[in-house]
Amino acid sequence: EHDLDALIFALVASGLVLARVVVDGVWRYQLGGWAPPWGIEYVVDPLSGGMMVLVSFLALAASTYAWSYLLATDPGRIGLFDSLYLLLVTGLLGIVATGDLFNLYVFLEISAIAAYALLAMGGDRATVATFRYLLIGTVGSSCYLLGTGYFYALTGTLNMADLTERLSGVGESPAMAVGIGLIVVGLAIKAAVFPFHGWQPDVYTYAPPPVTGFVAAAMTKVSAYAIFRVLYFVLGGTPVAASALVFLGGVGVLAILAGSWLALAQTDIRRMLAYSSVGQMGYIVLGFSIGSPIALVGALFHVLNHAVMKSCL
């Protein structure tokens, strides 16, 4: 059975959650009844609720095309595709909603493993491109996990809200700088931020079109959202966060120039769109780095804008 029912449910549920948090404020859920900071906490505010609606909508939109595509090309793998696709959507929704740094890593890995399997369904060249993505993605995941370990060693907690409070008493230290550097690099690899975009062009070119449409629209944007969340909601106001934002600003400018130039040089439209995405991610991280209310609103709006645009293309 196709996954449309599950995706429609996810979209409706995300919409209801967003409506609730807009009216009643931040919604928190303790997994397994264990109170934070010891237990895993999920936190949904209007921003994360909006991202959940966006991910669910994009997943549903791409899935409607995937059904007809698979019927025409490989009907025997529809069940496998549906299972992996729902796992990918679950991972992305978890990244958006979690209030725990390590739990974010878990959902990064869930979404990545599902994405690797889906992207490799495109054939021989897609398999090679996906293997390259797996290697680079593993480096990104390892960097993020090591960075999380540094912050746990400094504060003794992984809960984002508790971590924010404890960091105020830690002060600036080399360990904190290394930790945030590793986390930013790890998430930048996942978001295909220049110069960590090497996996993206081949994956976009050779992977099955329905998978490319969703991965290009949602996966990189969720990782960019995670960068924003960590730098502003977890580490906001710390000197290391300010330094990381300056780094992202320089990277953003280079991404805009390099991504746009490389896109113009392509003759394959899917590869051109891949390099175009590199440039667009540059605009997003540049907006994050500026940090003014207008810049942040513009960057977050461009997350929405580019996700919908790329999915349509």
Regions picked out by a protein language model, each given a short descriptive name:
Residues 1-83, 161-165:
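Transmembrane helix-loop-helix hairpins at membrane boundaries of multipass inner-membrane proteins
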Residues 3, 102-106:
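Short, aromatic-rich membrane-interface segments at the entry and exit
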Residues 53, 105-106, 273:
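Short beta-strand motif preference
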Residues 61-71, 79, 87-102, 114-313:
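Hydrophobic transmembrane alpha-helices and their helix-loop junctions in integral membrane proteins
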Residues 109:
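Short phosphate-coordinating micro-motif centered on Lys-Gly-acidic
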